[in-house]
C-alpha cells in the first residue's frame, strides 16, 4: 500500500505538458500561444514553493496569454496570504485571466476576490474582456452562485466575427456553449476523479470529464488540473497544464 501511494505521489509531481492545437472557424490577426491551467488549490497542501515551480513552467512557454479555469484557492485563504502567494502569481510574465471555481465559494468568495485583487490576475466573474482587440474572453461565475448570468446574457452585443473564448469551471451542460456560439471553452473541476477507480465513475458523470471535445463549431478542453485536492497523489490520472496553439481561418 505504501508503494502505491509513493508511486501516486510521483505521478502527481510529474506535471504533464498537454499540447493542443485549436483551429478556429474565424479569422485571427495572428496565432496565439495560450497556457491553460485549472484547479491550483493553493493553500495548506499546495504552498508558495510549489506555485513557484508552476510559474516557471508557465513562463518557460513564453505564452501570449494565460487562462485559469477556477479553483485557484483551495479552502482557507489564510495560508495563501501568509505565504505571500500573490507575489508569486505576479511573476507570471503574460496577461492572466481567470474565472471563479466552487472552491472559491468555500468560506466566502469575497476573501478570494480580495486576494486576487493583489495579483495581476484579471478575474472575470460573469464578465467579458477583449484581448489585443482580437478576441473576447468570457469568465462565468461558478455554478455555486445560482444567480449567475446565462451565456446568452454574457454574449449579447458581442461582435460575432471575433473569436469568443469561455472560462467555465464546471463542465456541465456543454451544449450551452454551443448554443451561445462559443468558439472554445476551457474547464476544470473534475480532476478526472484524481485516483482509480473514481476516474471511471467521473467519466460517466460528465459528457467529457477530461480532454478535448467538440460540438459543432464549439471546441472544449476539460483539464484534470495542475493541482490536487486532499492528498498529493494521483492514480490513473495526471496533473497537467495545457499549451494551446490558437489559430484562425485564413481571411
Predicted segments with their positions:
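Soluble catalytic domains of enzymes that build or remodel membrane lipids, polysaccharides, and related
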Residues: 18, 23-251
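Juxtamembrane/interface segments at transmembrane-helix termini
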Residues: 14-16
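Internal/C-terminal transmembrane anchor helices
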Residues: 1-11
Amino acid at each position: 500500500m505504501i508503494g502505491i501511494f509513493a508511486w501516486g505521489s510521483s505521478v502527481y509531481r510529474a506535471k504533464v505538458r498537454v499540447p493542443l492545437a485549436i483551429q478556429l472557424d474565424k479569422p485571427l490577426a495572428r496565432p496565439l500561444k495560450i497556457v491553460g491551467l485549472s484547479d491550483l488549490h493553493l493553500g495548506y497542501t499546495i504552498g508558495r514553493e510549489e506555485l513557484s515551480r508552476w510559474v516557471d513552467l508557465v513562463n518557460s512557454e513564453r505564452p501570449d496569454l494565460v487562462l485559469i479555469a477556477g479553483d485557484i484557492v483551495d479552502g482557507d485563504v489564510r495560508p495563501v496570504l501568509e505565504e505571500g502567494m500573490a507575489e508569486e502569481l505576479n511573476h507570471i510574465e503574460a496577461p492572466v485571466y481567470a474565472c471563479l471555481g466552487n472552491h472559491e465559494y468555500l468560506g466566502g468568495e469575497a476573501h478570494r476576490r480580495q486576494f486576487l485583487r493583489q495579483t495581476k490576475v484579471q478575474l472575470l466573474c460573469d464578465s467579458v474582456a477583449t484581448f489585443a482587440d482580437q478576441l473576447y474572453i468570457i469568465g462565468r461565475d461558478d455554478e455555486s452562485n445560482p444567480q449567475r448570468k446565462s451565456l446568452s446574457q454574457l454574449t449579447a452585443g458581442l461582435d460575432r466575427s471575433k473569436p469568443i473564448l469561455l472560462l467555465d469551471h464546471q463542465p456541465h451542460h456543454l451544449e450551452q456553449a454551443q448554443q451561445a456560439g462559443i468558439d472554445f471553452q476551457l474547464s476544470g473541476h473534475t480532476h478526472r476523479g484524481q485516483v482509480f477507480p473514481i476516474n471511471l465513475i467521473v467519466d460517466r458523470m460528465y459528457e467529457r470529464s477530461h480532454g478535448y471535445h467538440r460540438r459543432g463549431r464549439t471546441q472544449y478542453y476539460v483539464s484534470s488540473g495542475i493541482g490536487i485536492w486532499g492528498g498529493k497523489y494521483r492514480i490513473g490520472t495526471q496533473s497537467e497544464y495545457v499549451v494551446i496553439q490558437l489559430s484562425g481561418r485564413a481571411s
